Amino acid sequence: MTRTIVVGLGRSGLGAARLLKQQNHDVVVFERGNNEALQHTSKTLAEEGIQVVLGQPLTLQSFDAWRDNLDAVVIGPGIPWDHPTLVQLRSEGVQVRGEMDTAWDALQQIPWIGITGTNGKTTVTHLLSHVLEAAGLTAPMGGNIGLSAAELACQIGSGAKPRPDWLVMELSSYQIEAAPAVAPKIGIWTTLTPDHLERHGSLEAYRAIKRGLLERSECALFNADDPDLRQQRSSWNRGTWVSSEGAHPDNQPADLWIDDEGMVRNNTTRLFAADVLAMPGRHNRQNLLLVTAAALEAGLSPQQIADALRTFPGVPHRLEQLGTLAGASVFNDSKATNYDAAEVGLRAVQGPVVVLAGGQTKQGDASGWLKQLQSKACSLILFGAGADELASLAKAAGYPGELLQCPELESAVNLAEGAVQRHQASSLLLSPACASFDQYRDFEARGEHFRTLINPLLDEA
C-alpha cells in the first residue's frame, strides 16, 4: 500500500487525512505543534486508523523515516507552495498536492462553481449558494470558507450529505496554486488588487494564479467594473462580463448590466430591479450581477433569482449591520483584511463615520482607503500591532479628523462609544484594513469579539 503524508492538523489537513483514509490510503499526518488540543485530535485520528506525528517540522529530515512507499505529500493552504522542503521533494519525484486537489479528485463528477478574487468572493459565494438552494437545488458552499473542500468530499462520500447539484467553492490564490487540476464548470473572478504579495512575490504572479482557474473553467464570468480585470480584458477571447456602470463600461460592451433605471438586464431583456438585494454599496451591485450571471448559467429563471435575492440575510463579518449605538448604524466589517476591502466598506456606509481599524498590516496601496477616510471619517480609532503604522499613514496623508490609538479592540470599542456621541456620527464601522493574526485566530474570531463587545452598548430596538 502506498503512503500519503499530510502536513498540518488544521481544518484542511484534517479533511484531507480523513478523505484519503476513506479512499483506503495509508495516511500519516505531520504536525509541528504539540499541545493538549493537538494531542486530543491525534488520539481521535488514531482511533480512525490515521497516524499522527506531533512536533514534526516541515524539513527533509522529517521525511527520512517515511520514504518507503511514499506516494504523495498533501499540504493545506497555509503552507507555501514554494517551501524549500516541498521544492526538494518534488525534485526527487515525490508528488506534492494541495488539499483542494485531493477534493477535486473525489468530487469532479459534480459541477463546481469556483469563485476567486481579492475581495468580494466570500459575499458572492454565500449569495450564490443561497440563490441556488432557494431554487430547490442542493448547492453547499465550502473551500476557503465553511467546510474545507476535503471535508465536503468526506461527508458526500460517506453519505452524510446528499450528492449536490452544484458545489459553490470559494478559492483563494493559495488553494488554486496547489491544485492546478481544478477546472470548474463556472469560474467567477470578482476583483484583483495587490494582496498576499509577501507570499506570491509580485502582482503579476498573484494575477497569473487566479487567471489559471478562469482559463480552466468551462464558463468564465468577470467583473468589468474592476480596474485590473478591465485592463486585462483584451487578453481574453471568451467570457461573460458584468457591470454596475451600464452597458458600455470604459467603452467595452457588457453582457449583463444595471441600466439607468436600476434594472438588471442583458442584450435581449430586462430581468428584474437591482434593489431586490438590500445590501449597501456599489460593490454589492457587482456581486449581484456576478451571482445572477452564474445562476442563469446554472439554469435558473430571472424570477427565481430575484425571489432568492430578496431573502438573502447578508454575510457575517462583511458589512454586517448589528444595530445602532446612540443613533449611529453599527457595522461589523471584520472581513476587510486589506486596504481595498476597507475602502469599499467605507464607501458603502453613511458618513460621518467612526472607523475602527488595525491588526497585522499587509503590503498594498493605502491611497484609496486614506482618501475615503479624509472624506467620510470623523474619528479614526486604531488598535493592535499595526496601529502606529496606520497612524503614520493617516498623518502623512493629512487626515483631518480625530485620531486615537489603543492596544486592543476592547479599548477601541470603549473609545468609539464616546466618539459616536461627540461627533454625532451616522455610522460606526469596524473595518480593520489588516489581517487579524496579531491578536485573533482569524477575522471571524475578531468579528465575533466585536459583536460581543458592542452588543451591550446598542440602542434598544
Curated annotation (Swiss-Prot):
Biological process, per Gene Ontology: cell division; cell wall organization; peptidoglycan biosynthetic process; regulation of cell shape
Reactions catalysed according to its record: UDP-N-acetyl-alpha-D-muramoyl-L-alanine + D-glutamate + ATP = UDP-N-acetyl-alpha-D-muramoyl-L-alanyl-D-glutamate + ADP + phosphate + H(+)
Instruction: Name its pathway.
Output: Cell wall biogenesis; peptidoglycan biosynthesis
Q: Where does the chain bind ATP?
A: 117-123
Where is it located?
Cytoplasm
Indicate the enzyme's highest-level EC class.
ligase
Signal peptide stretch: none
SUPFAM superfamilies hit by this protein = MurCD N-terminal domain (SSF51984), MurD-like peptide ligases, catalytic domain (SSF53623), MurD-like peptide ligases, peptide-binding domain (SSF53244)
Q: EC? A: 6.3.2.9
What main location does UniProt list?
A: cytoplasm
Kindly state which keywords UniProt assigns to this record, in alphabetical order: ATP-binding, Cell cycle, Cell division, Cell shape, Cell wall biogenesis/degradation, Cytoplasm, Ligase, Nucleotide-binding, Peptidoglycan synthesis
Any one of the GO CC terms: cytoplasm
InterPro entries (alphabetical): Folylpolyglutamate_synth_CS, Mur-like_cat_sf, Mur_ligase_C_dom_sf, Mur_ligase_cen, MurD
Say which domain of life the source belongs to.
Bacteria
The terms under GO molecular function for this entry are:
ATP binding; tetrahydrofolylpolyglutamate synthase activity; UDP-N-acetylmuramoylalanine-D-glutamate ligase activity
Q: Which family does it belong to?
A: Belongs to the MurCDEF family.
Q: Which PANTHER family match?
A: UDP-N-ACETYLMURAMOYLALANINE--D-GLUTAMATE LIGASE
- Please describe what this protein does: Cell wall formation. Catalyzes the addition of glutamate to the nucleotide precursor UDP-N-acetylmuramoyl-L-alanine (UMA).
Give the protein name, as stated in the record.
Answer: UDP-N-acetylmuramoylalanine--D-glutamate ligase
Task: Please name the source species.
Answer: Synechococcus sp. (strain CC9605)
List the taxonomic lineage: Bacteria, Bacillati, Cyanobacteriota, Cyanophyceae, Synechococcales
